[in-house]
């Protein structure tokens, strides 16, 4: 007669013990089944579960875990190194430390932390084919993914609004956009993202494992009123609303660029009756720079679109048709949004490429950028050349603005003239070198000008000091929009 056997222990690859029934019940259907052990005490049961696997597993081939783990590792390394390079280059280069570029730096910071907090954990869990870091680790992992993902989306909306205001309302932004105001906007961005990332900690939805159960996210699979309400509000206020704002801004941005392109086509130079090669190059450059940010935004939205579709399918009641692969693959694609920013700037941003060649010469060689003409002196000249070109272009724009202001109230006219004089005073210093602008300047000189106070003199003097004789273009130029200088 065989002696009675003791309590059976479970192999690690077969155990699936949810940590909290209220949170993990929705995932039990996709986990492996357990053999029924002999009765043991509750204390021993808890110790046995903690000693093995405290989270459920899913029955899929090993190569599925390894493939996703390899992809997320490559994405994470690219995101960490690439965004660190963006942060370092923008902070070290004096010509790139502008209020507008603070938004780009913030985007790189959020993308860096997205890669730093998500990729290593996802990779380690994929190698072990199960979640390794317990319930608290799952909640923190999902919280970081939500916080940094929302921050990136709202930062892209702020970038679009900044471009919209500078390009379509250039005079209204003179002296308004500063580093302090940009910092306040970014503080609001982080607080907004934090406000939408904290509710799952307080019972409104939850942070739970997803897909192959090697990563975590908010609970979009449950069909409870609380979870569905959080999912819908989250998509409305952190995805669809920012996306609508971005679309609105870029519609008007490209309208302004198109109108200027049409003006270039009808413009004739002083001698010869055609456009100079430099005019065509400037127009092409402004088009390219306006498209850089749009490309970043489009890739970000496309990266998150599959994940959004999956979550909305679950919201609509079709969670039962979603497989673990359909949950995990879109999550990996969404996390890959963190690598687009540094890649696009390394390929298309001219000042960023020059700064890389200056501060990171080895990478400059790989990018095909020579550091020979990227020293501080060259950067100084390039910055002031852009400033001078921008001020000279204000000649035509201020004329139209003054005529519009004359139709408004007295207070509006005074404010517009004060702002315009700041740029007008600087532009007059070089007007003699722009023959095409001379006629416009003469006409403006004949018009009555409202007396200006000290407020208008100080910005004009500051802009005049920023100019240098070698920065003045010698050929005739068509003024372009003053807000189109990419910072």
Swiss-Prot record:
UniProt-listed PROSITE patterns: G_PROTEIN_RECEP_F1_1, G_PROTEIN_RECEP_F1_2, OPSIN
Topological domain ranges for the Extracellular compartment: 1-67, 124-139, 205-233, 313-327
Subcellular locations according to the entry: Cell membrane; Cell projection, Axon; Cell projection, Dendrite; Perikaryon
Gene3D superfamilies attached to this UniProt entry: Rhodopsin 7-helix transmembrane proteins
Entry's Gene Ontology BP terms: cellular response to light stimulus; G protein-coupled receptor signaling pathway; hyaloid vascular plexus regression; optokinetic behavior; phototransduction; regulation of circadian rhythm; rhythmic process; visual perception
Assigned keywords, A-Z: Biological rhythms, Cell membrane, Cell projection, Chromophore, Disulfide bond, G-protein coupled receptor, Membrane, Photoreceptor protein, Receptor, Retinal protein, Sensory transduction, Transducer, Transmembrane, Transmembrane helix
Domain of life according to the entry: Eukaryota
Classification via InterPro entries: GPCR_opsins, GPCR_Rhodpsn, GPCR_Rhodpsn_7TM, Opsin, Retinal_BS
Record has Membrane as a keyword: yes
Keyword Transcription attributed: no
Organs and tissues of expression: Eye. Expression is restricted within the ganglion cell layer.
TM segment ranges: 68-88, 103-123, 140-160, 184-204, 234-254, 292-312, 328-348
Record-listed N6-(retinylidene)lysine modification sites: 335
Cysteine disulfide partners in this protein: 138-216
GO molecular function, one term: G protein-coupled photoreceptor activity
Broad class of the protein's primary localization: membrane
Membrane-topology annotation of the record: Multi-pass membrane protein
One Pfam family cited in the UniProt record for this chain: 7tm_1
Cytoplasmic side, ranges: 89-102, 161-183, 255-291, 349-487
Compositionally biased spans, kind Basic and acidic residues: 440-457
One GO CC annotation: perikaryon
Entries under CDD domains matching the protein: 7tmA_Melanopsin
PANTHER family: OPSIN
Biological role stated in the UniProt entry: Photoreceptor that binds cis-retinaldehydes. Contributes to pupillar reflex, photoentrainment and other non-image forming responses to light. May be involved in the optokinetic visual tracking response. May be involved in the regulation of retinal hyaloid vessel growth and regression.
Similarity field: Belongs to the G-protein coupled receptor 1 family. Opsin subfamily.
Protein name: Melanopsin
Organism annotation: Felis catus (Cat)
Record gene name: OPN4
């Amino acid at each position: 007669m065989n002696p009675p056997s003791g309590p059976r222990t479970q192999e690690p690859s077969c155990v699936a013990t949810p940590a909290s029934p209220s949170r993990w019940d929705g995932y039990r259907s996709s986990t492996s089944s357990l053999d029924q052990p002999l009765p043991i005490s509750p204390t021993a049961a808890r110790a046995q579960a903690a000693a093995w696997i405290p989270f459920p597993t899913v029955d899929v081939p090993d190569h599925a875990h390894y493939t996703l783990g390899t992809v997320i590792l490559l994405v994470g390394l690219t995101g960490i190194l690439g965004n660190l390079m963006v942060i370092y280059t923008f902070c070290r280069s004096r010509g790139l430390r502008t209020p507008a570029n603070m938004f780009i730096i913030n985007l790189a910071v959020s993308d860096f932390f997205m890669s730093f907090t998500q990729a290593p954990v996802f990779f380690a869990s994929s190698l072990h084919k199960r979640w390794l870091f317990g319930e608290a680790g799952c909640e923190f992992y999902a919280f970081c993914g939500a916080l940094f993902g929302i921050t990136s989306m709202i930062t892209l909306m702020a970038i679009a609004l900044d471009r919209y205001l500078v390009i379509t309302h250039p005079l209204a932004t003179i002296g308004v956009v500063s580093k302090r105001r940009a910092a306040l906007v970014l503080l609001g961005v982080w607080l907004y993202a934090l406000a939408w990332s904290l509710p799952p900690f307080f019972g409104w939805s939850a942070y739970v494992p997803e897909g192959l159960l090697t990563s975590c996210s908010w609970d979009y699979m449950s069909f409870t009123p609380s979870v569905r309400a959080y999912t819908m509000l989250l998509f409305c206020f952190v995805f669809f609303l920012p996306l609508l704002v971005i679309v609105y801004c870029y519609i008007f941005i490209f309208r302004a660029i198109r109108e200027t392109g049409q003006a270039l086509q009808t413009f004739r130079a002083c001698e010869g009756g055609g456009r100079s090669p430099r005019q065509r190059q400037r127009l092409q450059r402004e088009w390219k720079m306006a498209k850089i940010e749009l490309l970043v935004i489009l890739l970000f939205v496309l990266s998150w679109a599959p994940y959004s579709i999956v979550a909305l399918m679950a919201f609509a009641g079709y969670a039962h048709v979603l497989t673990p692969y359909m949950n995990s693959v879109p999550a990996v694609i969404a996390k890959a949004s963190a690598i687009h920013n540094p890649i696009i700037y390394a390929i298309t941003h001219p000042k960023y490429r020059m700064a890389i060649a200056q501060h990171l010469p080895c990478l400059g060689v790989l990018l095909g950028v020579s550091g020979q003409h990227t020293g501080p002196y060259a950067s100084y000249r390039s910055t002031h050349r852009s400033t001078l070109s921008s001020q000279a272009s204000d000649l035509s724009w201020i004329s139209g603005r003054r005529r519009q202001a004359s139709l408004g109230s007295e207070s509006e006219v005074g404010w517009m003239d004060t702002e315009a004089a700041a740029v007008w005073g600087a532009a007059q210093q070089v007007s003699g070198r722009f023959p095409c602008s001379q006629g416009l300047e003469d006409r403006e000189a004949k018009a009555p000008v409202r007396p200006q106070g000290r407020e208008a003199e100080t910005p004009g003097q500051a802009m005049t000091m920023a100019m240098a004789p070698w920065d003045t273009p010698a050929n005739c130029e068509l003024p372009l929009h003053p807000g189109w200088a990419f910072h």
